Amino acid sequence: MTQKNTLLLIDGYGFVFRAYYAQQPLTSPKGEPVGALYGFTSMLLKLLSDFKPKHVAVVFDSGGKNFRHYIYPEYKANRPPPPEDLIVQLPLVRDVASNLNFPILEKNGYEADDIIATFATKTAALGENVVIISSDKDLLQLMSENIKIYDPLRGKYITEDDVVKKFGTTSDKLREVMALIGDRSDNIPGVPSIGPKTASSLITQFGSVENIFNSLDQVSSVKQRETLQNSREAALISWQLIGLDSNVDLDFQLNNLEWSPPNSDKLTGFLQEYGFRSLYKRAENLFDIKINDHKDIVDNKVTEIKEISNKLELENFAKDAEKIGIFGIYLLQHKGDNLAFILSLQNQSYIIKISNTSHDLFSYNAKNNNDWFSDIIFNLLADKSIKKITYSLKPLLKFYANQSHEITAIEDLELMQYALSAGLSQKNLFEEALKEDNRPLSKLAYREEFKGDTERSTAAYKSVREDASTGSTSKLPLEVEFGKRPIVINESARIVANFISLYKQNILELKDNKAFRLYSDIDLPICFILDKMEKVGIKVDANYLKQLSTEFGAEILKLEEEIFALSGTKFNIGSLKQLGEILFEKMQLPFGKASAKASSYSTGAEILEKLSEHGYNIADLLLRWRQLTKLKNTYTDSLPKQIDNITHRVHTTFLQTSTTTGRLSSQEPNLQNVPIRSSEGNKIRQAFIAEEGYKLISADYSQIELRILSHIANIDALKQAFINKDDIHTQTACQIFNLQKHELTNEHRRKAKAINFGIIYGISAFGLAKQLNVTNGEASEYIKKYFAEYKGVQEYMEQTKAFASSNGYVTNFFGRKCFVPLIHDKKLKQFAERAAINAPIQGTNADIIKIAMINLDQEIEKRKLKTRLVLQIHDELLFEAPIDEVEIIIPIIKKIMEYSTNMDVPIITEIRTGNNWMEIH
């Protein structure tokens, strides 16, 4: 990549922190955390391979205060300390550079940026080329003909066009612009309410921060002039803080930075000491050395399947698990009933049949008739020194719901696979490892799968008998009883035997795809929190729901009488076939169109709404009938039946792996779809109440998806609006309808809101026209004006569609891959493109709120509060708090939700309290 005499300057701690958050929390053979060390080593090896530098240096901060702290004591004061498992690795990162023979540069009182600036400018002055390896925006100030910036996150050189696109100015003016904007991550104040667009405009006009303050009377905006006047000192201090010192007193000798290959024995010892086996091959190829001690990572051979039927056998298994330090475990269920524990250890599977198949969450005690094994298994699950590998963790958490200790050191293959491939069918994920079947794990065990398939059934039995002939103790298929039907579980046992191998494979794959932090920091911890939420549930007023059901029922009967009167006959309104015949044959109404796949007429909402627009009253009655019957059947009739007899609360189930974006879903019952936009929907929400002595608290992210769009698509106009705390829907309405604020009506703002959120979902002119009840031409003009006002949105959409088409997926702010498998389907391409546009936004929203949930759970536990999280509804969290904790928890919720991630725009949370869910909306 580089020319012969190019100097490569590597931002050391920038790489280390990136490595920490990109890699899994690995441990060395001694049990020390080494994930950041591993990632740092891997990155340096890649740089050597890609750049083949003659001169190179890794530059480190010295730590402690530097000259910027004396200018501004609050500099970087808002930064939290690094995670503990990273702190212990920091003293060792220099060993990584040393073992790879990288020269190291650092000096007390100076940041790495200043040392990089010094060596870069001095080397460039000699006519040599410099490449700075960093994702730090501050270093963009150094860009010149001889100094290039290579962003390792994006794998590309940063160009002046990139700088202009992001900051609205060229690199030589970046210091001036950033002094006005400030830097939230470094606690550099800047000037309030000035974003990139305004800052670049001011610098274009005046040339520098100093010139602005020397010519304040020439600033046209009175508001800006006043803001600048009040922030003069902050802006000038920011200018000093952002600038780089290119005259650090260090011995500058380019020849001292010449790289030569490392000592092979020293490097081998280092890689072996920390257990970096997966780097052996790369090091061997790069440095032409030989490293012994290669070990096969995956061994799919299953030698035995045994049944454990007594305590002594299980105790022996536990002893072996303690020695080895890792085992597989799976709770086999069918239709919610617990059938067997399947354990695995060193290619052997062990089956423990469960005699009590009750799956009621609160009446079921894990012991009951299973005293001989339940405590032993739980002690293994709670042992921090033994790693457990499972698939679908929540059933295990529920089985041991009444235990006082927590399950620890457990990994979930299902969540690992989801972090790697959200949006892809889960049924294929075990295919390569198993070489036998590509159906979901939970379905592999059942004999009903072989029903009518003699060849497959025979093959399954033959496989078991072949095992027996080679020494296996499984003479016949192992079975457990489900009702009166035996279920074969040999196939499940074979899969569980592969858990450890699959885990090791997934670790490497997660690392290679930079997805481990998604799994370890978000998906795995949120599983425990969702389990807690499911156990807590939410209280529902059954008597009120019964009363509401009666009310709905009475109106439904009245509607039916009116429908029958208008149609002239009685019929089954719920039968689409009968309804179509009545409307379009008997009554001869227009718009009758037979469904393409059926002989019946189409009677969907679109047809009924069209009839309503043309004055046919029966259509209004039918729409109302459908609305009420759905509410009655889905909520007022069914919710009381789903109230638990012991807790007197409703307990939904949250699904983590059912969406393409990382979004959670809810089922049995679905409490994320409780209607809100109708008076009847609000009546149903009134049934969700706080326990006596408690209040419900709703914490709702405000316009979160538009804020995310402004950040990931870098939309200056949107950013500025959010920074200024402007009403974004009002701003959009003014632009779209060419009106001043005082001229706007509620209808204008409603339409602007529909446009703002419709664009996020890739809405077409046709779809928008229908939603706003305007012509296609008007809707098309609205979209055109929107793209003109918010420059960059259309470009983001086109780039996202192109990326999805080329790669089959898109990524969110956190790097989660959201796969779009239908992107090349001719019939569904437009749908897939809309999904691709929205997935990074919706996925980022989903991960932001999950991070907030994790942080809130930790804070509630830390403070020993009784407040509990009961529901998550996409961008809303619903809490139940004791009345005396409400004033304590509200500021905690607000702070954590608003600061769980760092974006270019503020994240705002709206909080309301009440006795029921309706009151807080």
Curated annotation (Swiss-Prot):
EC number: 2.7.7.7
InterPro entries assigned: 5-3_exonucl_a-hlix_arch_N, 5-3_exonuclease, 5-3_exonuclease_C_sf, DNA-dir_DNA_pol_A_CS, DNA-dir_DNA_pol_A_palm_dom, DNA/RNA_pol_sf, DNA_polI_H3TH, DNA_polymerase_1
Keywords of the record: DNA damage, DNA repair, DNA replication, DNA-binding, DNA-directed DNA polymerase, Exonuclease, Hydrolase, Nuclease, Nucleotidyltransferase, Transferase
A Pfam family assignment: DNA_pol_A
Transmembrane segments: none
Any one Gene Ontology BP term: DNA-templated DNA replication
SUPFAM superfamilies: 5' to 3' exonuclease, C-terminal subdomain, DNA/RNA polymerases, PIN domain-like, Ribonuclease H-like
Occurrences of domain RPE1 insert (ranges): 439-486
5'-3' exonuclease domain: residues covered: 1-283
Listed Gene3D superfamilies: 3.30.70.370, 5' to 3' exonuclease, C-terminal subdomain, 5'-nuclease, Ribonuclease H-like superfamily/Ribonuclease H, Taq DNA Polymerase, Chain T, domain 4
Top-level EC class: transferase
GO molecular function annotation: 5'-3' exonuclease activity; DNA binding; DNA-directed DNA polymerase activity
Catalytic activity entry: DNA(n) + a 2'-deoxyribonucleoside 5'-triphosphate = DNA(n+1) + diphosphate
SMART domains, sorted: 53EXOc (SM00475), HhH2 (SM00279), POLAc (SM00482)
Family: Belongs to the DNA polymerase type-A family.
Subunit structure: Single-chain monomer with multiple functions.
Function comment: In addition to polymerase activity, this DNA polymerase exhibits 5'-3' exonuclease activity.
Identification of the protein by name: DNA polymerase I
Species in which this protein is naturally found: Rickettsia helvetica
